[in-house]
Amino acid sequence: MKHHEMENNLPAGSDTSDAGGTLGTFAGVFTPSILTILGIILFLRLGYVVGNAGLGLTLLILLLANSISVLTSVSLAAIATNLKVKGGGDYYLISRTLGHEFGGAIGIVVFLAQSVSIAFYCLGFGEALAPLFNAHLSILPQIIAALAVSFLFIFAWLGADWATRFQYVVMAVLVTAIMSYFIGGILKWDSALLVQNWSSSPTSPGFWVLFAIFFPAVTGFTQGVSMSGDLQDPGRSLPRGTFLAVGVSII
């Protein structure tokens, strides 16, 4: 009887008896979220957005997109701290707040979206890597993407522990790439070029088209929710890791 009374007195978000996970905030939420946010859109399409919208409108796009991600993160934190979060990711949270019908419908869409995003990211990886080989082969990006998918399948087959270790390698490469970007911008600073690129291009497809191209870059913060079943304390790790990932990506 005392055991049940103690369980009922625990805060909803702090119950870890059913979590059964081993990952903490950094490995389980922050790392997968930040790796998805700073993904292929940032490296392959941000230049296109800046070149067409200009730096001024690009900053507005960043402000609007990140405002949406911050508000969504607040909602996610409110749900995670008021429920006993278990495995199931987005489906679990939505089904417990809006009902199983909404949870099932949205869960299927999220599953398909994440499946397609794997191919999308691998194709982007192949597109970026193909020019390094100087091979006159039109399907080389697709070949590289297929090899990347096979490589990721092996890690998924081995389990979450191997995938968690590998994501640290990816993060190290990502941090190096971003640092080189900032170092290059400081060393090659050109005020005249900044003024020239501030306004939008006459051939720009429009603000909302460019916003739609860039917006998927800020949606990766929900990736940590998918790891809810592997977290030691989902009620604490999900809001902390999500806010940390969104904050770092904004900076």
Regions found by a protein language model. Give the residues of each.
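Membrane-interface "cap" regions at the ends of multi-pass membrane proteins
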Residues: 1-77, 81-89, 195
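Helix-loop-helix junctions that connect adjacent transmembrane segments
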Residues: 10-11, 15-16, 58-59, 136-139, ...
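Juxtamembrane loop-transmembrane helix junctions in multi-pass integral membrane proteins
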Residues: 19-26, 53, 97, 101, ...
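Select transmembrane alpha-helical segments in multipass membrane proteins
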Residues: 23-33, 59-60, 99-112, 144-148, ...
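Hydrophobic alpha-helical transmembrane segments in multi-pass membrane proteins
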Residues: 36, 40-44, 61, 65, ...
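Juxtamembrane helix-boundary/capping and inter-helix hinge elements in multi-pass membrane proteins
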Residues: 53-56, 82-88, 96-102, 228-238, ...
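Hydrophobic transmembrane alpha-helices that form the core helical bundles
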Residues: 70-149, 154-157, 162
